[in-house]
Amino acid sequence: MREDIITALDYDGSGNLIYQGKAPAGSTKASALWTIKKFVYDGSNNLTDTQFADGNDKFDNIWNDRVSLSYS
C-alpha cells in the first residue's frame, strides 16, 4: 500500500463495500482531491459493476459528497 495515498471505505447494512475513495495523504474528506469508485450489487449481493464518480478516475471529487455524485 502506498503511504502517500489514503483510502476511505463506506459499507452498506449487509457489509458490502459500496464506495471506495483514494486521495493524497493529508487530504480532508471535504477537499476535491478524491477519486471515488462505487460498487454495484445484485439482489443476491453479488458484485455486478464498478463505476467511477463522474465516469473517470481523476482525483477531483469530494468524499463527503460521494452519495450525490454521478457514477458510470
Give the label of every model feature segment:
Residues 1-72:
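Viral virion structural and adsorption modules
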